[in-house]
């Protein structure tokens, strides 16, 4: 490898310094000082030198933004400090209430004015950047707030994220948080290019940014003109300024982009003025926003105010109303979802709203249709709720034509003809066809074959879809008529795997009553409820004949669940499917009815969270249920104890805050050993 001449090394250093300076002016300050052609010439020369003298390439060179080879997946990384979400304000009064709460907690006078740092709320992807000694070492998505995906290789392709901080005085370790987004012009260019190639276009810039960041090949990410805007810091070692505004200003001096619309406001009224101003210029901004964020400016006051479980008390996001437009309602169709929900869909005269052309919109349910008094032929107002999902929000009554037609709920399922029922207390009408309805067929069979139901090994979702599409099965019962030659010719199936599948289907005939009930897919009947039903109604005939009054006498069965169960067993199609399953040989041993009152954990509510080394979460829940405990998905003051494994998150924190007893895995094992005698067979 030849030695680098001094003159070349000097030119190299000058090129990098010059290019970094232009990147800063272009991407961070939005104030370019040279034409694009001149910038391209500088980059070409830098690449030429590095190609001739590869030993000169450094991780922070401007040329290293183009991604490396594709990754095989993303590693999960825990955030040292949680990346919490913000509480929302939707009305001006919500913001005034927030300001009042802040002043009350700080014991300020009623007429005191708190200083707030105000910024537009970018509609992008939250990201955490970690700098060590000024060098970017890691980029992680927000994820669930406690842990996210390591997308460092992709983050390094975002041109306004410095690979090395400018200047000096930055902390030895500094976590910077912000939003990665796709500017409107870049979004339009990507979609225009995709449309020209006949490819699927993105719905909105946020989806495009998310899809770009999660590319396993950073070279694809590099082709997208993503940008980042910083809004806060997380963990850091050293000192930073004492206000939100000054911290962001300091980040800008270190080479990171902050929002040029950032402003200080004194008191709630100035915050409202800022909100109205940003809303008025929203469409002129080069990026999508969905509101503004207000943060108490002084860091010491932020620390005094603290946090609730999921959000800081010192910040709030004031959301904008969704974009709206008027158009004509041409028709209302009723669609049947995979769970049987019968949903009205408005067919509209196409209208451009919120950046897209909308021709369909949700009407949610019949209650909403009645509330709006919707007629076919009406002029309606369409809103893109959350700037994503179009919905009908109102009717322009004075434009109703004389021939407008009211919208009635269908009495029968538009797919299978079964009764459409709407139970008291429920807004959604549902097809009662259950296992029979073809709209629900694939999902019904997937559920029937799942591990917690009939546990048919090897019958995954994709194979179910293939079997239905090839018309080899049309109901759960038809699974038991399959023969090995029927499936041997399917994708990724051979004679051996086909026979293994048939053997697994045959083995599933021997099950338990609780599993069979769960496998039927009755609405509101989960695994725990199925076990309750099997204990309370130990034969199929007793369960089929149970009235709603009988059902609500069973533990934890409420009137809504009882209504669903009763409705299911009243439908002839469902009874025929059950008979077909029994005729195919599905059976279970007689249920041994246990008295839960004598079980050691009777009357106690337990919660399982985190990762256990020797038990899946479902196994742990099952063991607790068999000891008489009621297993809940959330922690409250009524929780008896929490079983917490590794990486336990917010549930563990809440349990500790409430003083609820916490068992680690060793203590859980000890509990099981103490009551081993009660862990008998399954219902």
Swiss-Prot record:
GO terms for molecular function: DNA binding; DNA ligase (NAD+) activity; metal ion binding. SUPFAM superfamilies: BRCT domain, DNA ligase/mRNA capping enzyme, catalytic domain, Nucleic acid-binding proteins, RuvA domain 2-like. It comes from the Bacteria. One of its GO terms (biological process) is DNA repair. NAD(+) binds at residues 36-40, 85-86, 119, 142, 179, 295, 319. Pfam families: BRCT, DNA_ligase_aden, DNA_ligase_OB, DNA_ligase_ZBD, HHH_2, HHH_5, Nlig-Ia. It catalyses: NAD(+) + (deoxyribonucleotide)n-3'-hydroxyl + 5'-phospho-(deoxyribonucleotide)m = (deoxyribonucleotide)n+m + AMP + beta-nicotinamide D-nucleotide. Its cofactor is Mg(2+); Mn(2+). The active site is at 121 (n6-amp-lysine intermediate). Its EC number is 6.5.1.2. Transmembrane segments: none annotated. GO terms for cellular component: cytosol. The keyword Translocase does not apply. DNA ligase that catalyzes the formation of phosphodiester linkages between 5'-phosphoryl and 3'-hydroxyl groups in double-stranded DNA using NAD as a coenzyme and as the energy source for the reaction. It is essential for DNA replication and repair of damaged DNA. Belongs to the NAD-dependent DNA ligase family. LigA subfamily. This is DNA ligase. It comes from Hahella chejuensis (strain KCTC 2396). The lineage of its organism: Bacteria, Pseudomonadati, Pseudomonadota, Gammaproteobacteria, Oceanospirillales. The gene is ligA.
């Amino acid at each position: 490898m030849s030695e680098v001449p001094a003159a070349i090394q000097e030119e190299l250093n000058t090129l990098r310094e010059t290019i970094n300076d232009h990147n800063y002016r272009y991407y961070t300050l939005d104030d370019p000082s040279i034409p694009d052609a001149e910038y391209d010439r500088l980059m070409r020369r830098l690449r030429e030198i590095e190609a001739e003298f590869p030993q000169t390439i450094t991780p922070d060179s401007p040329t290293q933004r183009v991604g490396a080879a594709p990754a095989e997946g993303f590693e999960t990384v825990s955030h040292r400090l949680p990346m919490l979400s913000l509480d929302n304000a939707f009305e001006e009064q919500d913001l005034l209430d927030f300001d009042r709460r802040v002043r009350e907690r700080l014991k300020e006078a009623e007429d005191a004015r708190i200083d707030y740092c105000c910024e537009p709320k970018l509609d992008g992807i939250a990201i955490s950047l970690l700098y060590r000694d000024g060098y970017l070492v890691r980029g992680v998505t927000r994820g669930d707030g406690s842990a996210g995906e390591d997308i460092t290789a992709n983050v390094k392709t975002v041109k306004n994220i410095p690979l090395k901080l400018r200047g000096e005085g930055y902390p030895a370790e500094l976590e910077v948080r912000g939003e990665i987004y796709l500017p409107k012009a870049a979004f339009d260019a990507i979609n225009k290019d995709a449309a020209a190639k006949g490819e699927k276009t993105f719905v909105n810039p946020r989806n495009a940014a998310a899809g770009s960041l999660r590319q396993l090949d950073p070279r694809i990410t590099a082709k997208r003109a993503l940008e980042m805007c910083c809004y806060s810091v997380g963990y850091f070692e050293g000192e930073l300024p004492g206000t939100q505004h000054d911290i962001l200003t300091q980040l800008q001096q270190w080479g990171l982009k902050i929002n040029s619309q950032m402003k200080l406001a004194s008191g709630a009224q100035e915050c409202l003025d800022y909100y109205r101003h940003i809303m008025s210029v929203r469409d002129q901004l080069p990026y999508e926003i969905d509101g503004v964020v207000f943060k108490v400016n002084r860091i010491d006051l932020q620390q005094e105010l603290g946090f609730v479980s999921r959000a800081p008390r010192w910040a709030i996001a004031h959301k904008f109303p969704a974009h709206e437009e008027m158009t004509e309602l041409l028709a209302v169709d009723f669609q049947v979802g995979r769970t049987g929900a019968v949903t009205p869909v408005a067919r509209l005269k196409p209208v451009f709203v919120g950046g897209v052309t909308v021709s369909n919109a949700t009407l949610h349910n019949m209650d909403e249709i009645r509330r709006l008094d919707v007629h076919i032929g009406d002029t309606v107002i369409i809103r893109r709720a959350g700037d994503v999902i179009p919905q009908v929000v109102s009717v322009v009554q004075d434009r109703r034509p004389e021939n407008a037609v009211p919208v009635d709920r269908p009495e029968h399922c538009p797919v299978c003809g079964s009764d459409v029922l709407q139970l008291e207390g429920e807004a959604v009408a549902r097809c009662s066809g259950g296992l029979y309805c073809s709209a629900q067929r694939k999902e019904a069979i997937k559920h029937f074959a799942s591990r917690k139901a009939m546990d048919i090994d090897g019958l995954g979702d994709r194979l179910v879809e293939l079997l239905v599409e090839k018309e080899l099965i049309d109901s759960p019962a038809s699974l038991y008529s399959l023969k090995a030659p029927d499936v041997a010719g399917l994708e990724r199936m051979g004679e051996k795997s086909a026979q293994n599948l048939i053997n697994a289907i045959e083995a599933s005939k021997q099950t338990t009553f609780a599993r069979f009930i769960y496998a039927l897919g009755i609405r509101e009947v989960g695994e725990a409820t199925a076990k309750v039903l099997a204990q309370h109604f130990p034969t199929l005939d007793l369960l089929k004949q149970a009235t709603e009054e009988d059902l609500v006498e069973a533990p934890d069965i409420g009137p809504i669940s009882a209504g669903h169960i009763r409705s299911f067993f009243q439908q002839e199609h469902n009874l025929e499917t059950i008979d077909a399953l029994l005729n195919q040989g599905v059976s279970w041993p007689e249920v041994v009815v246990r008295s839960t009152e004598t079980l050691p954990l009777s009357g106690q509510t337990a919660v399982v969270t985190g990762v256990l080394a020797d038990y899946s979460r479902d196994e742990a829940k099952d063991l607790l249920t068999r000891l008489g405990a009621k297993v809940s998905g959330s922690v409250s003051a009524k929780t008896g104890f929490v079983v917490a494994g590794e990486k336990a998150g917010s549930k563990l924190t809440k349990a500790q805050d409430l003083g609820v007893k916490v068992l680690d895995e060793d203590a859980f094992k000890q509990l099981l050993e103490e009551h081993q005698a009660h862990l008998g067979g399954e219902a």
